[in-house]
Amino acid sequence: MTHIRKSHPLMKILNNAFIDLPAPSNISSWWNFGSLLGICLILQILTGLFLAMHYTSDTTTAFSSVAHICXDVNYGWIIRYMHANGASMFFICLYMHVGRGLYYGSYTFLETWNIGVILLFTVMATAFMGYVLPWGQMSFWGATVITNLLSAIPYIGTNLVEWIWGGFSVDKATLTRFFAFHFILPFIIAALAMIHLLFLHETGSNNPTGISSDTDKIPFHPYYTIKDILGALLLILALMLLVLFSPDLLGDPDNYTPANPLNTPPHIKPEWYFLFAYAILRSIPNKLGGVLALILSILILIIMPLLHTSKQRSMMFRPLSQCLFWILVADLLTLTWIGGQPVEHPYIIIGQLASIMYFLLILVLMPTASTIENNLLKW
């Protein structure tokens, strides 16, 4: 008799995705981040749901409702900080996941990769709108600055910004709609993640060597279920250390001041996970140019498969490309640091150089290094 997990219509889907799935025998811990992102998403949806039960999306009460959650709701403080820091963990996992994809050439799975890029944009949009909800100073001014970027679009820009605001400034209408979008988007992300997984399971996972692993597969369960559980425990440990010991480490003190349209904070900056893109935006002295650079800094991921000139898929056996990859990582860390600094010398020039370096590495240096490595193989 066939086991129920192989015959039941629903169980069969789960079985083929998480139990009897043939997986490469050599995938490293860099392949853990997919499941960790799933855990982050579930955690964010659950904590967000409980926060939404007590939050009010009105400009007059939003700030005090968050204070009420922290001060009066049973365990409200831990739910709030798990949600805020959960977003940081989400982005750490996200950047590691994308970095893994770049290093090991996973972007050759086109559908999986493209849906992944769409997911990245959606998560970034969700996080941005979530940051506006507590209605502190940085919430308000962050929303004002970022939405205002759309006014750089020729002809329709100003109308577009006012349409998004629902008025002539960031106000009640903006906060209400941001809350509505922030609530719905995670469910869209969950649906996209399932499609992401569906396309991945069409091809099977990549592995560190980049060579086909069809001849050497092992079942996902128990080997990778136990590995994912270890990853999950480490993720939760890191999150809870952050939440319980330094919950405000990654936040901005300005957000503990209620939003005031008449008083601009000295340094407007987004959360840490957007600083690299913010630095690229600021490094161009033209508004439209900056906005384009900002969008392209992430949209560039879409063309990664076109920039792959190597005869090998993975960077495992390509020392030149490895070197450039880690320079790119260092460059992104530099941009993250610059994004949090004031706009003054020497930060301006460092930001501009790091921005040029970012695009130069991806568009020119890495494809060139790959071609050189191809020629070295002939020797």
Swiss-Prot record:
Subcellular location: Mitochondrion inner membrane
Cofactor(s) it depends on: heme b
Biological process per Gene Ontology, one example term: mitochondrial electron transport, ubiquinol to cytochrome c
Binding annotation for heme b b562: 83, 182
Pfam families, A to Z: Cytochrom_B_C, Cytochrome_B
The entry's keywords: Electron transport, Heme, Iron, Membrane, Metal-binding, Mitochondrion, Mitochondrion inner membrane, Respiratory chain, Transmembrane, Transmembrane helix, Transport, Ubiquinone
Co-factor: note: Binds 2 heme b groups non-covalently.
Membrane topology, from the record: Multi-pass membrane protein
Protein residues bound to heme b b566: 97, 196
Any GO MF annotation of the entry: metal ion binding
Keyword Iron among UniProt keywords: yes
Binding site for a ubiquinone: 201
Keyword rRNA-binding listed: no
GO CC annotation: mitochondrial inner membrane; respiratory chain complex III
Chain segments annotated as transmembrane: 33-53, 77-98, 113-133, 178-198, 226-246, 288-308, 320-340, 347-367
Described purpose of this protein according to its UniProt entry: Component of the ubiquinol-cytochrome c reductase complex (complex III or cytochrome b-c1 complex) that is part of the mitochondrial respiratory chain. The b-c1 complex mediates electron transfer from ubiquinol to cytochrome c. Contributes to the generation of a proton gradient across the mitochondrial membrane that is then used for ATP synthesis.
Quaternary structure and interacting proteins, as annotated: The cytochrome bc1 complex contains 11 subunits: 3 respiratory subunits (MT-CYB, CYC1 and UQCRFS1), 2 core proteins (UQCRC1 and UQCRC2) and 6 low-molecular weight proteins (UQCRH/QCR6, UQCRB/QCR7, UQCRQ/QCR8, UQCR10/QCR9, UQCR11/QCR10 and a cleavage product of UQCRFS1). This cytochrome bc1 complex then forms a dimer.
Record-stated family: Belongs to the cytochrome b family.
Note: Heme 1 (or BL or b562) is low-potential and absorbs at about 562 nm, and heme 2 (or BH or b566) is high-potential and absorbs at about 566 nm.
Name of the protein in question: Cytochrome b
Organism: Syncerus caffer
